[in-house]
């Protein structure tokens, strides 16, 4: 019985028993923030079980896609090494919400297993909770299971109700006993019945768990019977498929065998029992469905778990000799197996492939380098030894190796990892990052005076500003002398302190015979402004009165960019959609840099529309208005609160053009003051986050003039009017392509000539097979594959290996005619030579490619081919 039939029969059986078939919910739980991923069938019904949600049915059945990787439920490290661990699995379940209870739940389960699935009754064992006499009697007296195959399990986990057969949603809440059904694989497999000392063996395998929620547990541990007890059951599709298909390992069922075969196809591996193929087959399921449900590879949360799974799969592909992107090519094979049951997978297959390919390409750049570092480090660690934490951290921080990936490799080499050392290295980096943060100059200053009164909204110059504190090298002092760097705190200031993405002001603090150049303004603490800079003249003391003067030109450029950011944010939401939310910003005199939530690059048309909308607001020359009001009133009035910002009870609301946002920054008086708005770049900075950089005013004018000058220069070089540049460039490109084609044909002729010479002069016959191994000079490495194909045809039966080197890199191509691949495989041949020249290789049995870097070792490696082939023919 195929896996798809097993799933279908399960759902149809319970539908015939009055159950509503409920589609699988997302792998990202929508109702439980404590869960990283959906890990069982009951998750989507949690609020129904607790009474918070009512549904139009009291009986339900589902096939729930589930993930156990990361967080409390993490099977990742075991996947590929055991018969039943998976990152992704399907949980078949039936549920009763105050409808039927133990009798029907047990009767339904037994009928499905023995009548529909036709499992031999003598192969089925059951367990019940020690005190659940009701379930015991149903199994023994009504179903007729022999008592020797019914096992009572007590509190076997060290506390009251702590048992394999007692389920609890949490420390408090719904709970109750459960009964589990086991399948006996027979005496040929080691293991004992559940509850016995040998229960960890593989002979008796749990296939179905029936949970009876019949109590409410309070904080004191008291159990109160529920007025409407419920049923929650779960049976892993992969486990029951293994039983019904007569195999012992989940990886031997039809669904996995198709995926394993596909993984072997993409990696060029012949041994379908290789554990790495199991890892890849498992991981393509988890990765694909996580992407379907909106998870994108990133460096935090669910996205990082996905990234870890992808990179673990890629490492196993690399272990099999596959150095090129391959994982994404398994998506169509997965759709063929599971697309009918889960149409959302088929609908998003292209998107899934794109995300996986992008992640493969990103990690592929560092995987090989990281593996070399790890190989060198492991060569110095004996079996049973410890890989140091600094190497672990370097692989994690520089090469993107998740720690569990490195641990996976170390386990294969029988080496432990120094997690304490890794955590210490990680903490050192955190300390360094904190020290280098944006409050680097102000952090740690001890200030206990009054807050600074900010006057910079209305004026850029303030007389009578009194010095309330001075700091040199982080230490409070009474005076500062000329030539010293210092932080000055004033009772009032026109200087804006860095906040909300807007940089701090610069300028001067002056008095008679005294001049302090302010290089930056940062907050020492909430409401206290620190003016950071250099005392150029005089002696500055606490209590001095100064004239504070902001650099007006720099401030004007900054406020133009800040106000333009508000208009751009609003325009982005109009053009791209209401999902656009700010994820970060930097506003300085040169530009505005704006990060926002969006999952695709902006098109040229979208960028042009945003520019047009913003510049229309600029031309309207509307006045900006700032008001202070209660936060709740501001939000009710339509003001946008920004991601990551913290607001007090009272906020400042800025209306500028068609935008209304909460903002404490400084802005233009009218939109016309912005002058001109131009987007100069757009790109991605993280999964689901795009970045736009834009300029305004005189900076935008200079940029336009520079772009025009570049166009004029290009027109001069190509001898074409600016308006005709696209056509002229297309002509030049066509000419270049034609010349490249001529060059390629010439190289092919040279290569063919060189190949003919090799066939005549260098091929030797070994046991009736022509063997040719040679280094080709003055030949483009890209031409090697064609040469190998030609030589195979010319010499067949033949085994050919050609090498070329350029710029310190060796290219290897091996080919074996089809009639010889049973004895000699091209992938093995290329791998043999590549290993001697400091590289790796692999591919199909008839054609393989590889490379290396040790050019000096190449002649000896080529010379060794004949003996290697002779041993195998």
Swiss-Prot record:
Binds 1 zinc ion per subunit. Zn(2+) binds at residues 562, 566, 663, 667. Transmembrane segments: none annotated. The keyword ATP-binding applies. GO terms for molecular function: alanine-tRNA ligase activity; aminoacyl-tRNA deacylase activity; ATP binding; tRNA binding; zinc ion binding. Keywords: Aminoacyl-tRNA synthetase, ATP-binding, Cytoplasm, Ligase, Metal-binding, Nucleotide-binding, Protein biosynthesis, RNA-binding, tRNA-binding, Zinc. This is Alanine--tRNA ligase. Its cofactor is Zn(2+). It catalyses: tRNA(Ala) + L-alanine + ATP = L-alanyl-tRNA(Ala) + AMP + diphosphate. The keyword RNA-binding applies. GO terms for cellular component: cytosol. Its EC number is 6.1.1.7. It is found in: Cytoplasm. Consists of three domains; the N-terminal catalytic domain, the editing domain and the C-terminal C-Ala domain. The editing domain removes incorrectly charged amino acids, while the C-Ala domain, along with tRNA(Ala), serves as a bridge to cooperatively bring together the editing and aminoacylation centers thus stimulating deacylation of misacylated tRNAs. Belongs to the class-II aminoacyl-tRNA synthetase family. The gene is alaS. GO terms for biological process: alanyl-tRNA aminoacylation; negative regulation of DNA-templated transcription. Catalyzes the attachment of alanine to tRNA(Ala) in a two-step reaction: alanine is first activated by ATP to form Ala-AMP and then transferred to the acceptor end of tRNA(Ala). Also edits incorrectly charged Ser-tRNA(Ala) and Gly-tRNA(Ala) via its editing domain. InterPro entries: aa-tRNA-synth_II/BPL/LPL (IPR045864), Ala-tRNA-lgiase_IIc (IPR002318), Ala-tRNA-ligase_IIc_anticod-bd (IPR018162), Ala-tRNA-synth_IIc_core (IPR018165), Ala-tRNA-synth_IIc_N (IPR018164), Ala-tRNA_ligase (IPR050058), Ala_tRNA_ligase_euk/bac (IPR023033), DHHA1_dom (IPR003156).
């Amino acid at each position: 019985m195929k896996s798809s039939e097993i799933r279908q029969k399960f759902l149809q059986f319970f539908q015939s028993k009055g159950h509503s078939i409920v589609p699988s919910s997302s792998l990202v739980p929508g109702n439980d923030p404590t869960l990283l991923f959906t890990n069982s069938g009951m998750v989507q019904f949690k609020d129904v079980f607790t009474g918070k949600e009512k549904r139009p049915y009291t009986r339900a059945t589902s096939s729930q896609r589930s993930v156990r990787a990361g967080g409390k439920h993490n099977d990742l490290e075991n996947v590929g090494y055991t018969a039943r661990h998976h990152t992704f699995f399907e949980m078949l379940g039936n549920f009763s919400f105050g409808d039927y209870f133990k009798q029907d739940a047990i009767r339904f389960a037994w009928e499905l297993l023995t009548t529909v699935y036709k499992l031999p009754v003598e192969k089925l064992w059951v367990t019940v909770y020690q005190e659940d006499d009701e379930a015991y009697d149903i199994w023994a007296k009504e179903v007729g299971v022999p008592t020797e195959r019914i096992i009572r399990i007590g509190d076997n986990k060290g506390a009251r109700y702590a048992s394999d057969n007692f389920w609890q949603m949490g420390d408090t809440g719904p709970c109750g006993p459960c009964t589990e059904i086991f399948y006996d694989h027979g005496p040929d497999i080691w293991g004992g019945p559940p509850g016995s000392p040998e229960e960890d063996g593989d002979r008796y395998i749990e296939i179905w768990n029936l949970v009876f929620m019949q109590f409410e547990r309070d904080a004191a541990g008291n159990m109160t019977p529920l007025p409407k007890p419920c049923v929650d059951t779960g049976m892993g599709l992969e486990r029951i498929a293994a039983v019904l298909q007569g195999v012992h390992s989940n990886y031997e069922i039809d669904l996995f065998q198709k995926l394993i075969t596909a993984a072997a196809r993409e990696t060029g591996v012949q041994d379908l029992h290789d554990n790495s193929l199991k890892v890849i087959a498992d991981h393509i399921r988890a990765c694909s469905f996580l992407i379907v449900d909106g998870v994108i590879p990133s460096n935090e949360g669910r996205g990082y778990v996905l990234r870890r799974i992808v990179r673990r799969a890629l490492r196993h592909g690399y272990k099999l000799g596959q150095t090129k992107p391959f994982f994404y090519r398994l998506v169509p094979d997965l759709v063929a197996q599971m697309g009918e049951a889960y149409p959302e997978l088929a609908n998003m297959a292209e998107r899934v492939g794109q995300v996986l390919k992008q992640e493969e390409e990103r990690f592929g750049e560092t995987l090989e380098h990281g593996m070399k570092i790890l190989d060198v480090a492991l060569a110095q660690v004996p079996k049973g030894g410890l890989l140091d934490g600094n190497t672990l951290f370097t692989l994690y921080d520089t090469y993107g190796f998740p720690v569990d990936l490195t641990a996976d490799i170390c386990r294969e080499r029988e080496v432990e990892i120094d997690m304490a050392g890794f955590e210490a290295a990680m903490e050192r980096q955190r300390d360094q990052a904190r020290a280098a943060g944006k409050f680097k100059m102000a952090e740690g200053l001890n200030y206990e005076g009054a807050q600074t009164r900010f006057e910079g909204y209305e004026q850029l110059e303030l007389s009578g500003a009194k010095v309330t504190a001075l700091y040199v090298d982080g230490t409070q002092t009474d005076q500062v002398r000329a030539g010293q760097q210092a932080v000055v705190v004033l009772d009032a200031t026109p200087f804006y302190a860095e906040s909300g993405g807007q940089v701090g002001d610069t300028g001067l603090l002056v008095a008679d015979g005294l001049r302090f150049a302010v290089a930056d303004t940062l907050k020492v603490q909430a409401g206290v402004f620190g003016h950071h800079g250099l005392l150029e003249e005089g002696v500055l003391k606490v209590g001095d009165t100064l004239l504070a003067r902001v650099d007006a030109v720099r401030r004007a450029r900054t406020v133009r960019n800040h106000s333009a950011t508000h208009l751009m944010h609003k325009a982005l939401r109009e053009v791209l959609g209401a999902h656009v939310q700010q994820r970060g910003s930097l506003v300085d005199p040169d530009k505005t840099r704006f990060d926002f939530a969006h999952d695709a690059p902006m098109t040229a048309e979208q960028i042009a529309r945003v520019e047009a909308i913003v510049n229309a607001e600029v031309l309207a020359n509307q006045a900006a208005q700032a008001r202070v009001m209660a936060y709740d009133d501001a939000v009710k009035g339509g003001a946008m609160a920004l991601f990551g910002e913290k607001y007090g009870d009272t906020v400042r609301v800025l209306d500028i053009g068609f935008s209304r946002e909460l903002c404490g920054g400084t802005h233009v008086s009218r939109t016309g003051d912005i002058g001109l708005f131009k987007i100069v770049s757009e790109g991605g900075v993280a999964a689901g986050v795009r970045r736009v950089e834009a300029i305004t005013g005189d900076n935008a004018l200079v940029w336009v003039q520079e772009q025009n000058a570049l166009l004029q220069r290009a027109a001069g070089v190509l001898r074409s009017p600016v308006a005709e540049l696209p056509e002229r460039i297309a002509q030049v490109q066509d000419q270049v392509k034609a010349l490249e084609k001529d060059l390629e044909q010439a190289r092919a002729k040279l290569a063919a000539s060189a190949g003919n010479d090799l066939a005549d002069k260098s091929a030797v016959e070994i046991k009736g097979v022509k063997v040719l191994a040679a280094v080709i000079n003055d030949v483009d490495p890209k031409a090697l594959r064609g040469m190998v194909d030609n030589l195979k045809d010319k010499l067949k039966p033949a085994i050919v290996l050609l090498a070329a080197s350029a710029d310190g890199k060796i290219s290897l191509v091996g080919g074996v005619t089809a009639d010889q691949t049973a004895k000699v495989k091209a992938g093995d041949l290329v791998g043999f030579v590549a290993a001697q020249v400091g590289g790796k290789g692999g591919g199909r049995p008839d054609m393989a490619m590889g490379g290396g870097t040790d050019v000096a070792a190449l002649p000896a490696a080529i010379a060794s081919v004949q003996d290697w082939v002779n041993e195998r023919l």
